[in-house]
């Protein structure tokens, strides 16, 4: 949640502007974003791509950036052509934490009455699968933001940390909860109590990351995964996502009961019938998201 001066000091040389691939298709939403870039990608524009774009601040998560992120997520969630979303940052940083300047002078009353950081939770309410493509620093709020996503791909030089204790606070956007559920108590406790960072390789070994990619191909590989997801039925993908996420909230018995209920629910969809019929007929399924 914190952007630390000591972390910023480790970056040498001028920051490069975000690299924009010529193949990226413009995001025709009418939205005018200052802190993010939002575009549709994939052969059939089935992937929503959101790039955090505050390079001089290492993508520090100010209120304006989070508001724009939520706007873009809402637009992609409501776009029937989009089946999955990729969230990324820059080569130096996915996001180096929350914007400390916005938090420095807040009181308890300010935080409590305004439900500070509450609007960060919008990402967890998105029904479409979201992939975090993490290059560079994912510290504090940046690590928490990545953990809100459904899948994390990491560049080979990515680093993850919850260093809030070094500035006299604790994670406030799910860091102590999601990290513990993902990597276990011992590693989570060590990271939260020391502020130490872990590498992409350590994160993968701990189960925080599902794939490590070269820095230069990370986003494209995440998009390829998103395209594969988007080729399936959106309504069935949403059910699958709901069932997997329930494993973090329920007992095994409760989760299995929900899974069974969602499994039965697929039999009320045309896509379930089409998928099984296509399998029997040895052809590719033509899902209609119905």
Curated annotation (Swiss-Prot):
Q: Name one GO molecular function term.
A: delta(3)-delta(2)-enoyl-CoA isomerase activity
GO CC aspect terms: mitochondrial matrix
Pathway assignment: Lipid metabolism; fatty acid beta-oxidation
Provide the catalytic activity annotation: a (3S)-3-hydroxyacyl-CoA = a (2E)-enoyl-CoA + H2O; a (3E)-enoyl-CoA = a 4-saturated (2E)-enoyl-CoA; (3E)-hexenoyl-CoA = (2E)-hexenoyl-CoA; (3S)-3-hydroxybutanoyl-CoA = (2E)-butenoyl-CoA + H2O
UniProt KW keywords: Acetylation, Fatty acid metabolism, Isomerase, Lipid metabolism, Lyase, Mitochondrion, Phosphoprotein, Transit peptide
What EC number is given for this enzyme? Answer: 4.2.1.17, 5.3.3.8
**Site location (Important for catalytic activity):** 164
Q: Residue positions of the PTM N6-acetyllysine?
A: 101, 115, 118, 211
InterPro entries listed in its UniProt record: ClpP/crotonase-like_dom_sf, Enoyl-CoA_hyd/isom_CS, Enoyl-CoA_hydra/iso, Enoyl-CoA_hydra_C
Give the transit peptide range: 1-27
One biological process term from GO is: fatty acid beta-oxidation
Q: Which residues carry this modification: Phosphoserine?
A: 114
Q: Where is it predominantly found?
A: mitochondrion
Binding of substrate occurs at 98-101, 141
Q: Where in the cell is it found?
A: Mitochondrion matrix
**Chain segments annotated as transmembrane:** none
Superkingdom, natural source: Eukaryota
Q: Which CDD domains match?
A: crotonase-like
**Which parts of the sequence carry Phosphothreonine?**
46
Identify one Pfam family in the record.
ECH_1
Report the family membership. Answer: Belongs to the enoyl-CoA hydratase/isomerase family.
Q: What does this protein do?
A: Converts unsaturated trans-2-enoyl-CoA species ((2E)-enoyl-CoA) to the corresponding (3S)-3-hydroxyacyl-CoA species through addition of a water molecule to the double bond. Catalyzes the hydration of medium- and short-chained fatty enoyl-CoA thioesters from 4 carbons long (C4) up to C16. Has high substrate specificity for crotonyl-CoA ((2E)-butenoyl-CoA) and moderate specificity for acryloyl-CoA, 3-methylcrotonyl-CoA (3-methyl-(2E)-butenoyl-CoA) and methacrylyl-CoA ((2E)-2-methylpropenoyl-CoA). Can bind tiglyl-CoA (2-methylcrotonoyl-CoA), but hydrates only a small amount of this substrate.
**How does the record describe its quaternary structure?**
Homohexamer; dimer of trimers.
The name this protein goes by in its record: Enoyl-CoA hydratase, mitochondrial
């Amino acid at each position: 949640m914190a952007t630390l001066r000591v972390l910023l000091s480790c970056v040498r040389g001028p920051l490069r502007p975000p690299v924009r691939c010529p193949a990226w298709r413009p995001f025709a939403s009418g939205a005018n974003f200052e802190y993010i870039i939002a575009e549709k990608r994939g052969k059939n524009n089935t992937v929503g791509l959101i790039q955090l774009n505050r390079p001089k601040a290492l993508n520090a998560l100010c209120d304006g950036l989070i508001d724009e992120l939520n706007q873009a997520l809402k637009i992609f969630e409501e776009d029937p052509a989009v089946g999955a979303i990729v969230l990324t940052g820059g080569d130096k940083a996915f996001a180096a934490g929350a914007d400390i300047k916005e938090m420095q002078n807040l009181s308890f009353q300010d935080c409590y009455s305004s439900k500070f950081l509450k609007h960060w939770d919008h990402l967890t309410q998105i029904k479409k699968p979201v992939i975090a493509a993490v290059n560079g620093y994912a510290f504090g709020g940046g690590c928490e933001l990545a953990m809100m996503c459904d899948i994390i791909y990491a560049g080979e030089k990515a680093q993850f940390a919850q260093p809030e204790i070094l500035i006299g606070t604790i994670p406030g956007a799910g860091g102590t909860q999601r990290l513990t559920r993902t990597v276990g108590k011992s590693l989570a406790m060590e990271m939260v109590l020391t502020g130490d960072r872990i590498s992409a390789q350590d994160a993968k070994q701990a189960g925080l990351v599902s794939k490590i990619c070269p820095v230069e191909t990370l986003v494209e590989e995440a998009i390829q995964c998103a395209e594969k997801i988007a080729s399936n039925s959106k309504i069935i993908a949403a059910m699958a996502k709901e069932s997997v996420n329930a494993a973090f909230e329920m007992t095994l018995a409760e989760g299995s009961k929900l899974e069974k209920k969602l499994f039965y629910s697929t039999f009320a969809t045309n896509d379930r019938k089409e998928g099984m019929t296509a399998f029997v007929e040895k052809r590719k399924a033509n899902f209609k998201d119905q």
